[in-house]
Amino acid sequence: MAEETQHNKLAAAKKKLKEYWQKNRPRVPAGVNRNRKTNGSIPETATSGGCQPPGDSATGFHREGPTSSATLKDLESPCQERAVVLDSTSVKISRLKNTIKSLKQQKKQVEHQLEEEKKANNERQKAERVLEVQIQTLIIQKEELNTDLYHMERSLRYFEEESKDLAVRLQHSLQCKGELERALSAVIATEKKKANQLSSCSKAHTEWELEQSLQDQALLKAQLTQLKESFQQLQLERDECAEHIEGERARWHQRMSKMSQEICTLKKEKQDMRWVEQLEWSLSKLKNQTAEPLPPEPPAVPSEVELQHLRKELERVAGELQSQVKNNQHISLLNRRQEERIREQEERLRKQEERLQEQHEKLRQLAKPQSVFEELNNENKSTLQLEQQVKELQEKLGEEHLEVASQQNQQLTAQLSLMALPGEGHGGEHLDSEGEEAPQPMPSVPEDPESREAMSSFMDHLKEKADLSELLKKQELRFIQYWQERCHQKIHHLLSEPGGRAKDAALGGGHHQAGAQGGDEGEAAGAAADGIAAYSNYNNGHRKFLAAAHNSADEPGPGAPAPQELGAADKHGDLREVTLTSSAQGEAREDPLLDKPTAQPIVQDHQEHPGLGSNCCVPLFCWAWLPRRRR
């Protein structure tokens, strides 16, 4: 299309140029044609534009005067016309050039327009393709949206059905809730009635328990003083043992240095004796090999003074070794007895601390029913950890004492057995053959490095023993100081407020009176009062245990424990656990409160978790009981 329009435009431009040339072509005047016809003899002048040469004109002018002037005028007029025509043609040519330039510019513009149209067409085609792709994607998206709408409609229908089911279930649950609230209100009313009945009985009982707790406090103070005195005695005994061990250590160093010197001298003497015997034997051989046989001379035997001196030294060394063995055995026995006494004292201290802890927890339970349970748990955990550390240290001390004593005994017995063996060698055979009195054998003592290693190992064991004893002292001091501070603080607090919060918590009617206030504190106090009322018979066993402990505290001092107590402790383990569990079981069978609904969960908790009674009775029991009452 663009090429056809271009060709058409070019054809139209050519036509316009032809018409313009035809219109503006110069026309020849009539006089010129006539001159050409008349003057046939001079065609050159006519063709050359009517201009004659000067000679001819002159001749003609001279020849024909009047006619020449007329012809000149006639010739001048066409020349002028031709000049005008030439001017007009030059103007026309310039115009034509301008028109050509304008046409070229138009052509360029047309070509530029054609290129732009081509570009626009290409862009339109690209846009059409992009639009087609977009239309296809939109169609696909439309189909996907239709499928999503279908699925959404199905899910909406499903959710509507589920919402209907949930509404039905909610109605059913609301009905059940109303029924449960009615049942709970009935149960609460019955429990209030029972609690009102029990509160009247529990007031007198709690007053009596408070009096008993004050009496127990006095007993505990007396026991604390006894414990302090026994602890001071233990410290003195330990100091004496430490001094005795240091003295024995110095003596042992001196004896070992003397023994090492004597062993070195004995080694040298033995080597000299053997060397002398070898020389004598070689001399006897040489004498026998001589030509003249001589009667054999008796071998050179050491003098009786030297033999007696050697025997005395051997007897002295054996006696010293035996005395050292006896001393070591005596030291080990003393250490064992001291460890047994320390263990017995620690067991008694532990029992007394447990009794104090139980009594204090009981008093604290009566005074503060709710706010101190977490602190007691943390304290019990810390005390258990300290007790475990003390037990581990005691076990380590006992094992290391036994190991050190056994190693010492083995070393000493080995030395004695080596010294008791008979001497070997040629000299011994020769003396036996002579029939003389054989001296006691020389001791085959181990070399110096081995003895030094044994000494260093023994000293290391002694150092470790001393370090462990110091560690045990520090742990026991920390443990006793901690419990003394805690017991003094708690007893002071309870004595400063004897009739305040305890009576309010125990005698105030439990959570039945506090239930009117509608708070968590009332519920906690009521739970504590119910726990005290249900646990009243269990406290009788605890008082029996305290009486037995008081009787055991009046027995002889810690240095000489009764064998019956030790046997009972070995058979039955912890006295506190046996008495508490037996009393609790015996009274649980005869307790009339077990048939009541408020006391049954308490007994179930105690039966399911028997470890709770071994550490702390009342606080953990009430701590396990409070969450159920809060629920």
From Swiss-Prot:
Keywords recorded for this protein, A-Z: Coiled coil
Bias (Gly residues): 507-519
Disulfide pairings: none
Compositionally biased region (Polar residues): 38-50
Compositionally biased intervals (Basic and acidic residues): 568-577
Coiled coil spans: 85-149, 209-247, 303-419
Gene Ontology BP terms: Golgi organization
Keyword DNA-binding in record: no
Gene Ontology annotations for the cellular component aspect, listed alphabetically: cis-Golgi network; Golgi cis cisterna; Golgi cisterna membrane
Cytoplasm among keywords: no
Region ranges (Disordered): 1-72, 422-451, 502-523, 551-610
Pfam family, one: GOLGA2L5
Record-stated family: Belongs to the GOLGA8 family.
Name of this chain's protein: Golgin subfamily A member 8R
Gene assigned in the entry: GOLGA8R
